[in-house]
């Protein structure tokens, strides 16, 4: 391909779950095993090949290290760290080394966050008044549209790897959501985009960039769910935009964190009464 063709590489994953109610219709958000927030993140990685090589090299060194031989997640049959880094499953010492490595990569991270209590209360009201059930995929697709609205017009070829959500194949729906994001940008700014958009659902073991965005989301999730900022702080400069859509203390569309408004634990505390 000609050298003047501009590429953008994006990697998409989620954190949290989309569980809202028990079998009797009671809201269970925040109970053990159920997250308070749901977030979707996009990592823009300048050089995916280098990232892949360095992550694979780190994994190979760790797999060969005697100290980690007996750790279950390092065993090939466990299908965890041995095939892909995953912040939730990785041994603490290994997680530290992954965090240290990914800080050096040329990465920009964009995240959209929903408070599940807010979603659940609206959903319950809609069901009572209209008989309308909550559509979980619609929540995910809406965040995809918000994230990609301003990310699709700066390259000739946009390659998007999206972490598979369970066994469900939703390529067509994701393509529609991303195409709508492109249309929303054009409608707002009156700028047309001729980018060629290539979308491919994948597993983190297949695409190293998905392991990167998983780590960034895990660090942010710990900040939101547990008010722990020790993982977030070293990575903070890489998060270019965090859209907290249900924190409407100051603006009706939510709180947007960026260089102009850096996210801190102090800002999150007291953000919601629920």
Identify the residue ranges that each predicted region occupies.
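Phosphate-ester processing/binding pockets and catalytic centers
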Residues: 1-274
